């Protein structure tokens, strides 16, 4: 059995609905409309560090503070509504960051056509690295707190942008197994990058897919190249790499 055959088998094992039960992706699965799914997914992915139980609990609190109607809250919130978000905290992401995210998302949905269009309009060189870079620029084009900038990664600054790439996988990829949503038909799955972190990097090195020691933007480019050789159409299907 070669590496591709091994990874394909493992991908089928992991990529099923049973995975949802203990994963943060369960949060956007609670919603029905496109905007609610993508907003809840983006916010959940943003705070996805730490153990999964903590991430899920914090994401549920986020959605509760948005009255379980995230798109409507973001578009129609009042200043009084925003004050209620100050109680939120997950690790270093606090209520002030949450308020900034709501304001920035409102700008994106009201003035830029929504999250999908931000990524679609800035695709370049068969990847979404430039789209992620431009997302950060657009996200903080309005008046903002400097402290909140650290919560939106930028591959052009050397980051592997794990959480945004995880969010993009959820939105773009669709293999009919009911895990990822496949909501964004405008973006090819071939442009996706794997969510790279310490665990992913270590597994990739053991499999001979990655030589670079750091888990950064350069490592992601190297890993992208290898995974696209294995599957040019769906390179991020290899769940084994990032399922611990």
What do these predicted regions represent?
Residues 1-48, 53-63:
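Charge-rich, intrinsically disordered N-terminal extensions
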Residues 2-30, 83-113, 233-238:
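A cross-kingdom feature marking charged/low-complexity
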Residues 29, 33, 41-52, 88-92, ...:
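Short, charged/polar micro-motifs that form catalytic or ligand-binding hotspots
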Residues 49-67, 75-79, 91-106, 200:
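Non-catalytic DNA-binding core/recognition domains of DNA-processing enzymes
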Residues 67-81, 123, 214-217:
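A Lys/Arg-rich helix-loop hairpin that forms a DNA/phosphate-binding surface
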Residues 88-188, 192-199, 222, 232-236:
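Hydrophobic, aromatic-lined core segments that form the binding pocket/scaffold
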Residues 192, 207-235:
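Catalytic cores of DNA base-excision repair glycosylases
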Residues 242-243:
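Conserved small/polar residues in nucleotide/adenosyl-binding loops
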């Amino acid at each position: 059995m070669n590496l591709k055959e091994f990874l394909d088998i493992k991908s089928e094992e992991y990529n099923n609905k049973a995975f949802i039960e203990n994963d943060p992706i369960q949060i956007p699965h609670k919603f029905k409309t496109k905007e609610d799914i993508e907003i809840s997914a983006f916010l959940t992915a943003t705070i996805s560090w730490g153990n999964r139980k903590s991430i899920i609990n914090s994401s549920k609190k986020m959605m509760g503070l948005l009255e379980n109607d995230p798109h409507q809250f973001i578009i129609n919130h009042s200043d009084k509504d925003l004050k209620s978000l100050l109680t939120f905290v997950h690790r270093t992401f606090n209520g002030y960051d949450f308020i900034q995210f709501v304001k920035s998302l409102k700008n994106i949905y009201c003035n830029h056509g929504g999250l999908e269009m931000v990524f679609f309009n800035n695709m370049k060189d068969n990847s979404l690295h430039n789209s992620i870079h431009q997302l950060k620029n657009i996200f903080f084009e309005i008046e903002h707190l400097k402290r909140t900038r650290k919560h939106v990664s930028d591959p052009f600054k050397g980051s592997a942008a794990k959480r945004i790439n995880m969010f993009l996988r959820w939105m773009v990829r669709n293999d009919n197994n009911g895990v990822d949503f496949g909501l964004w038909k405008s973006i090819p799955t071939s442009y996706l990058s794997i969510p790279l972190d310490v665990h992913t990097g270590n597994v990739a090195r053991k499999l001979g897919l990655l030589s670079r020691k750091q888990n950064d933007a350069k490592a992601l480019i190297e890993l992208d190249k290898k995974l696209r050789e294995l599957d040019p159409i769906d390179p991020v299907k290899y769940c084994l790499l990032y399922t611990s």
